[in-house]
């Protein structure tokens, strides 16, 4: 598919004043194609209702459509079960949920949380807050000149005091893509939980 054909699906680029525009802020939010806009309008016009809480026709329709999306995401991500797919408002809320509901109960004073020094605020601030709340230590994983996590140096940091590791797959700042499989395998050797911020990678990897 050609670039101009792809652009034709986005109303923003079809207006005369925007036909030559290039939108670079997709890491924050993307322009929406017409098919997405049409479906949102269709929802609000024809079956706007709460999901999973009512038995009326509208609610059943909304719930069915909602769960169908969950199934599609499961297939796209090759998840084992659709219950592994949890919808939130975005990556920032998701990471905060992990920090406060999963990591906080297992962390104590002087424990270590490892992150890369190239994280977006959404994958840095939650760990800074948690470290302050619990007395844990936040440490940065070493990176090389290509802004990639150095596996050999990372291995030297992994020990019984490290209780959690969090890193991005693809940086929305530099575009650097981590060797995420290697990092996960390395961290798992020490039975340490690891979280991957895959917000950028899911569309590009």
Where are these regions (language model features)?
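Pyridoxal 5′-phosphate
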Residues: 1-205
């Amino acid at each position: 598919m050609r670039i101009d054909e792809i652009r034709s699906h986005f109303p923003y680029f079809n207006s005369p004043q925007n036909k030559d525009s290039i939108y670079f802020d997709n890491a924050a939010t993307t322009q929406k194609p017409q098919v997405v806009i049409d479906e949102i309008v269709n929802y609000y016009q024809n079956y706007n209702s709460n999901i999973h809480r009512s038995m009326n026709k509208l609610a059943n329709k909304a719930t069915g459509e909602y769960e169908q999306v969950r199934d599609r995401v499961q297939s796209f991500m090759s998840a084992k079960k659709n219950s592994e797919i949890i919808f939130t408002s975005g990556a920032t809320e998701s990471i905060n949920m992990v920090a406060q509901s999963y990591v906080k109960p297992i962390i104590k004073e002087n424990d270590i949380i490892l992150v890369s020094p190239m994280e977006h605020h959404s994958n840095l601030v939650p760990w800074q807050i948690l470290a302050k709340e619990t007395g844990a230590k936040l440490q940065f994983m070493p990176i090389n000149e290509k802004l990639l996590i150095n596996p050999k140096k990372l291995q030297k940091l992994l020990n019984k005091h490290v209780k959690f590791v969090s890193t991005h797959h693809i940086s929305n700042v530099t575009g650097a893509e981590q060797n995420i499989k290697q990092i996960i395998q390395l961290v798992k050797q020490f039975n340490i939980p690891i979280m991957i911020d895959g917000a950028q990678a899911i569309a590009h990897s």
